[in-house]
Structure formats: C-alpha cells, structure tokens
Amino acid sequence: VTDGRAGEAPGAGTGTDLARSAARGAATTTAARAVRIVVQIAGLVVLARLLTPEDYGLVAIVGTLAGVAELLRDFGLSNAAIQAPVVTAAQRSNLHWVNLGLGVLFAGAMVALAEPIADAFGNRDLVGVVRWMAVVVVLNSWATQYRAALSRDLRFTALATLEIVSLVVGTALAVVLAWQGWGYWALVAMQLLTAAVMCVGSTLQGGWWPQRFRRGVPLRSFLRFGSQVFAAQLLGYASRNVDTIVAGLRFGVPASGLYNRAFQLMAMPITQLTYPAGKVALPVLSRLQDDDARFERYLLRGQTVLLHALLPIVALVCALPEQIIDIALGPTWSQAAPILQILALGAFFEAANFSPSWVLQATGATGMLLRYTLVAKPLMIVLIVAGSQLGLEGIALGYAVGAALTWPLGLLWVRRVRAATARHLFLNGAVAVSGHIAIAACVAGVVRVLAPDSAWTALVVGAGTLAVVTALLALVWPAWRRGVLSLLWTVQLARARAGRPAR
C-alpha cells in the first residue's frame, strides 16, 4: 500500500448522487440479505429435521460466549474506521494489527476457559466446541478492517457477495455433515468454513496488505470512539443473548436449544434487514451530520423503509407462530411456538429502536450512546432474569417488555442531541408499529375463523390478509400511505440505478 490517504472517505457529492448511492447501497445489501434469509431458512428447515435441540443448544451456548470474544476483538474499531473523516494507510494497518492481536488474545482465553465452561453447564461436549469456535474468532479478527474498508468505500456489492458466498458454502457443508450423522459438529464446521471464506475473500477484495505496526501513528481518536461503541455494543449484546445463557443454566442444554431456535427464527429477518440498513445508513448519515435538514430527511426515510420492509414479516410471525414453527422446524419443535409469538411482540418495538442508535453513532455522540446503553441494557437483562422464574415463556416475555421500554428511552437520548429529530422518529415509528400490530391481529383473526387445514394454507391466507389490510390502511390513513409510498419510491430508485456499475 503506497497511498497515504487510501482510506479517505468519498465525497458526498450532490444530493441526488448521494440519494442514488444510498438507494443503490440499500438495494444491494437488502437484496443480499434477502438471499441470505432464503439460504438460512433453507438450512434451518433441513438442519432442524436432522439435529436435536441439544445439538443446537451446545452450539448456541458457545456461540453466545464466542460473541463476547468477537466484540472484544473488534473493540468498536470497525465502526471507528467507517465513521472517521480520513483513515490513512498507516492507521488502517495499525488498526488491523490491533484487531488481530485482540482476536488472538481472546481466542486464547476461550481455549483456557473451555473446561470451566463445560463444568458450569454440566456437559463435557462443550470443551471441544469452545476450542474450535476460538478459531472462528481469530479468522474474523483478521477480516475486521478489510470489511470496514469495503463498507467505508461504499463497496456494498463486494461485501454482499462475500456474505452470500460464505454463508452458502458453510450451510451446504453443515447439511452434508448433519446428513452423515455428525450431530453438533456440523454446526461447528459451518461456522469455521463461513469465517474462513469471509477472511480470504475480504482480503482479496480489499486489494491491500497491512504494513508493519508503526509507533507514533495517531490512533487515539479511533480508540476513544471505538471504546465507547464497544461498551455500548457489549451491553447490547449481553441484553440480547443473556436469555440463551439463562435458559441453559436454569433449564439445561436442550431447553437452551429450544429457546434459541425460536429466538433465531424471529431474529433472522430482523438481523438480515437491520444489519445492511445500518451499514448503509451510518456512512451516509455521517457525511450529512452538518446538514440538519438533509440528515433528518435521509434518517426518516431510512427508518420508514426499514420498518415497512421488516414489520410485515414480524406481523406474520406474531399472528401464525404454530404454523411458522411447523414449516420452519417441524412438528417436533411445537413447544417453541408460544416462545416465538412472545418474541415477535417484542420485535415490533425492537425494530423501531435501531434508528436512534444511527443518530448517536453518525453524529459522533458515542458518549451519549454509552450512557443510554448503561441504563437500557441492564434493564433488559434484569427483566429477562426475572422472567425466567416463569419458565422459557417468561424469559421471552422479559425480552419483549424490555424491547418495548427501551425504544422510548433511546428517543430520550436522541432528544438531547436533536430534539426535533427525536419527535419525528417517534411519530414515524409509532405509525409503522401500531399499523402492523393491527395487521397482525387481523391476520390472526382471519386465520382462526377460516381454520385452514395445513400450515402452508394458513400462511398463504395470512399473507393475503396482510396485503389487503395494508392496502386498506393506505387508503384511509395518510401517514401510513406516505410510509408505503416511501418504500416503493426507494425500490423504484434502486431499480433505476441497478444498471450502473457498482463500486
């Protein structure tokens, strides 16, 4: 690498150019996530019929613990690199070595703690799983700054391609191994191959090689920003994953697997849509943080498009949990249906709570984000632990109540940065959330009255009911109509730009 300013952010350009770039980026990443959802659902449908709740429970518990190591090895530095106005080649290389060093350190800690972890959950199979998952942490740590650079340069197509290819080959391997009777090792192998493909692919796509670590290269601003983001992410991660650990500790590894499959089934569409939305929103909004009018316009449009794309899926899951479980996991997982429905209720509010974090990160208000997280996430954890007194459904209820409470809390912190923006975010989100909850109630009512004779028929009836009620709301509710039209406008703009070469 010879370009001393290789990581300088692209210019914002004109409003139309940025709108098209954002729309194209959103379309590319959303389309990729749609493909990911299809692949993940296909893998889920097959693997759930080949593996047991205990198999899933083992990998879910270790995956949750490995996720902590993943956050530690990232330390918020990927977000720091994306958000910074300029990243020199030397800074990028130093950040790479910092991430890799942290990855090796915490992977080593996982290996050392494998025996105590297995003892805590009373299952010796966890020892091998923990040690192999540590390799995944190292592979991901190498790829951290390569992926950040691709995102920073708005190379969304390259990122999307890598994510799809890695997932497809990993899922294919897992299905083959599960079919041959490898049990939970099929899931471990999937994680390893997915990480390896992403590691190699991002390095090749990046087109640069890290220089040696140089002393004196300024990293303080990255470390300060990253540490605040990391603290917020760590608490957020704990609040989202403590339920799996609590389920395993209190009710055993199979119960943890049952709960985790319900949670992942609900989290899958949320993650696959909010992750690319955030990857597009953060660099775009960061470039607009000094232009209040354009910042708010892009923010509200992004929130609207995200909610109107995501919440119809949540509404169907909330209305038809038994049918969704039967189709996705099979009848042997029927006990997960009430858990799934409760989690879906919380997902309405969780989806609305992503845009406040965009505001705080894009404007550099990471201290504010940390203070919000220090209040909201411990609240979520307390509710989940308290709910565990009522069983697995109680854990899900604690999560749902926490999601409903933390949405307005997030807006209170945004209000300290941009008061008008917080108000508009709330009104915008309230329209989408309330409308889709009403749609879910209508879908559940129609399916209950018609009583279809199969899960697939019920899903078709539910989807048709959702479409009809959505159209009726657009006719009688102007705010709802504007949201639907905004989604359609974004899709149309993205299609208009689809013929242009991607960066």
Residue ranges of predicted features:
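N-terminal membrane topogenesis motif
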Residues: V1-I41, D74, N79-I82, V86-W97, ...
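Membrane-interface junctions at transmembrane-helix termini in multi-pass inner-membrane proteins
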Residues: A80-A89, L139-L162, W185, G206, ...
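Membrane-proximal transmembrane or re-entrant/amphipathic helices at the cytosolic face
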Residues: T2-G13, L412, A420-A422, A441-R503
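Hydrophobic alpha-helical transmembrane segments
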Residues: V127-A134, L162-W208, R224-F225, R261, ...
